[in-house]
Amino acid sequence: CHVDDIYRLAVFGNHSPTMFPDLENTIVNGKNAYESINDHSWVEKEFLPKIQQRGAEIIEARGASSASSAARAACDTVKAVEHPTRSGDVFNAAIMSDGSYGIPAGIFSGFPLLSDGSGNIEIVRDYNLSEFAKSKIAITANELLEEKDLVKDLI
């Protein structure tokens, strides 16, 4: 599998242990990623925690900040906004929520997005989410609300 074979992968939330990479709407090699994995328990108990802890693992392995990863993500986001999203795909970035997917309006969260290539982006709203996915998104949304509350005196 090559990265170009992956479509519609969205990560909801923030770069933290509560972020939620949605496999239920992800397409790999033309097939639904979640349905292609026979062991859904593995997804929930091993894959998701591994992804959620990846940032901490990188910091531990490097013995330093993951600032270079953040810089790369920023560059990738600028490129995604400057070019039209490929047909049938999305790109992922954190933007201010409008209430989509149960993430309260006014907080920044990762969403599946489309770009027209002229700097205009929009949230893709056609993802069907299971109760499991909704519960994971609620956890990350609550974390973001708590973080917003912690800095409310600064904004």
Task: Please tell me what each predicted stretch does.
Residues 1-155:
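C-terminal substrate-binding/catalytic lobe of Rossmann-fold NAD(P)-dependent dehydrogenases
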